[in-house]
Structures are given as structure tokens and as C-alpha cells.
Amino acid sequence: MDQRPDYHVFRFPSATQTGMIEGRVYLPLEMDETIECIQIIHGMAEHMDRYNSFCRFLVQEGFAVCIHDQAGHGRSTQSPEHLGFFGPVNGADTVLDDIDTAFQEAALRLTDPTDALRIRRFLLGHSMGSFIGRLYCAKSDANVAGAIFSGTSGANPMVGIGILLAGIVIRFKGASYRSKLLETMSSSGNLKRIPDARTPFDWLTRDRAIVDAYNADPACGYRFTAAGYRDLLTWLKRVSSKHWAQQVPVECPVLIVSGDQDPIGQYGEGPAAVAQWLEETGHQVTCRIYSGGRHESLNEINREDVWRDIADWLHRHSDR
């Protein structure tokens, strides 16, 4: 009987210089000549454990999965004081380097340098992770076979003001300062379409058990540092135009999933705008907006349908 673990843990020094990054690679059921690996980039103020069930679903569909806790998140923090912190400077750039290293670490555990196995990578970024993933796909050396963006956003006219304000806070309070004003600017309207909200995070999903688990988890829902907000808004600014879409290789197909009750996605308008930028620049894009869905499509009450749609899309673009 096969007793192998379903994932291997890897660690490496973060390019942000904030400490060690911890990640996992979930092994595919079979090692074919081509291994297709889904690299997941999680969202703001959460961690990779929240994706365990989805990762195992993808494995059952025949894929390998790579995921890591980003700097300032989950097991990649040295202490609670480091939560929501990508470093005092250049975090918006160095976090992308960690994406590269995480995939390289996963590849080492999926293949032997002497064999002929080939790894094709798909990216899946959620929320903040979708901004990072969108920016990563525009890199000239990204080498991504396809991308999935969940809970993403269109252009936000307040981004420039937010970056300016974060810079002022950093100057006078320090990069690690946690500003209630910055938090309020980023999230104050998230519950406006939920009149019966029980908690500050009901906008995430209609699944109450998942909301309650998120609220009870000290590694979720914390206030970002001022530098963390600056980096978050910088990512969004860099991907909020057709110019970004023009930098994404046209041969990279894209799937966008979102809920029409997601405030981060402007209630469906943001993902639709992102899809339009991609379509106008010649990309093959599929946009799925789920009725009644809130921010976390992967954790919604209709998540089995969402997971199935993602797997079907991956199979359509598979080389296997």
C-alpha cells in the first residue's frame, strides 16, 4: 500500500528579507511525462491552510499543487508583529521573487534533474494574490501556461490617494505601524450590501462556518502594516489598465472567477473590466461571475460548482 505523504514541505529565505518562507507541494496521483502544477497565491491576511481541501481536490483531478505562505503571513512570519509586513522597502517587487523561488522548490520535489519529466505551470491567485499573479504574468520570463484570478478587482480611483497616505504614515510612524485609517479606507464599505451581517467578515462568503473559522483564527483578518498597505495598493495600481494586459503573453489563457456580491470586485464590474482589457488585447479569457457569490468563490456555498468549473478549464488547457 502506498504510504507516501500527499505533500512535501519546503522552506527558503524570502527575498523580502523578512525571514523564511514555508510552502508545500502536493504530489500528483501519477507522475506522467508532463506534470501540470497549479501554483496558488493566497490573499491578504490569510494563509495556505485555508486551501487544503481545494488543493486535494486538484490532486484528485490529476494535478500537482504548489502553495506557500507569503511573507508576513501564516508560517512565513517570525512573530505576530511581522503579520502583514513584506519588508520596509521594495516589498511590491521582492514578493514576486518569492513566487519564482517557491515554484523552483516545488519543481525539485516533483522531478529528478536526470529524468525527462516536464512541468507546466498554471497560476491561481486570489484577491491580493490575484493582483500579484496578474503582475507576475506580465513578467517577460514568467513561463505560465495559464492563469486563474479569483476575487480580483478592476481599477480603483482611490489607489493613488491610498499609496500617498501610506507613504505619509510610513514617514511619520514607521513602516511597521498599523494604521486604523488605512484599514478603514480599504474595507469600510465591504458590508454595505449585507444588511444582516453577523461579523465584520461576512462579505467573504455566505458559508457561516468558514466566516466563523476566519474570525477565530489569529492568523486571519489582522490589520496590515502601513508598508503592507503601500505594497498592496502598488500591485493593484500596476495591473489596473489595458497596458498591463498588453504585457501578458497572448498565448496565456485566463479564467476569472468572482461573485456578483463581492465588494472587492465592485460587485462583478471589476472582473468584467479585467476580462475586457484582456479580450481587447487578443487574449483567450473566460469570465465566470456567480450569482449571489461574495468574495471567496473557493469557499462559497456553491464552491463545488466553482471547483468543478476551474478543473474543467484546466483540463481543457492541459497537455495531458
Question: Over which residues does each language-model region extend?
Answer:
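Short beta-strand/loop motif that positions the catalytic acidic residue
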Residues: I256-S258
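Active-site glycine-rich loops that stabilize anionic/oxyanionic intermediates
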Residues: I35, H42-E46, S127-M128, D260-Q261
